A protein has these predicted regions:
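Short glycine-dipeptide loop
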Residues: 33, 128-134
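Class I S-adenosyl-L-methionine
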Residues: 143-178
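Short, well-ordered beta-to-alpha junction loops that form the rim of enzyme active sites
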Residues: 40-42, 137-141
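A short glycine-rich, Lys/Arg-flanked "PGG" loop and its adjoining helix->strand segment in the class I
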Residues: 100-130
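Adenosine-cofactor binding site in Rossmann-like domains, unifying the SAM/SAH pocket
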Residues: 14-17, 40-78, 83-85, 90-92
Length: 178
């Protein structure tokens, strides 16, 4: 499968999906009447199931992202989710800021972003149905990965100018179990 690649420019925003090309990227995959999950939703209500650690957001749940995904598994959503979103904090500093906002003490293991991402991806994966899509956002293209049976179908770079890192938006499709 050929990977669709594009690049846009837009000013950065703390609310990732408010950046027009990024919001458009999400809406492209967010079809009506599908089951969608966002473990790091903040105030976005575009998705069927939303979560954010911060209780001052509009998310439906306020759990650790891994725990949220496991709650949905227990509710019978294994293999039923059409669209998963991975828009977690991009850096250890951002993780620390999120924890501090809610008065949670931050330990070194909490800011090991690769461990957080792996735990959440491992918990999100069983929810995604075959041919379901996961959209990942950040500063790399690690995504769900081939070991979990995913194939990259689209990458969009969004340049923010100056000394800002680009936001990398990636869509992956879940193939049959390897």
């Amino acid at each position: 499968m050929d990977i669709i690649f594009s690049r846009d420019w837009a000013m950065p925003n703390l609310d990732t999906f408010s950046v027009k090309p990024i919001g458009d990227f999400v809406k492209k995959y967010l079809k009506e009447n599908i089951i969608s999950v966002d473990p790091f939703a903040r105030d976005k209500d575009w998705f069927t199931y939303t979560n954010d650690l911060n209780p001052n957001t509009k998310a439906q749940y306020h759990l650790d992202a891994e725990e949220f995904c496991k709650v949905l598994q227990d509710k019978g959503l294994k293999g039923k989710v059409d669209l998963g979103i991975m828009d977690s904090p991009y850096s250890p500093r951002q993780i620390s800021e999120c924890y501090k906002q809610i008065g949670k003490k931050v330990a070194m293991e909490d800011t090991q972003s690769s461990l957080l991402y792996k735990r959440v991806r491992d918990a999100l994966d069983p929810l995604i149905k075959e041919n379901g899509i996961v959209l990942s956002f950040g500063w790399n293209t690690v995504g769900m990965g081939i070991k979990r049976g995913y194939e990259i179908i689209e990458i969009k770079l969004v340049c923010h100018g100056g000394a800002h890192n680009d936001t990398i938006c990636m869509a992956e499709i879940k193939n049959s179990v390897i």
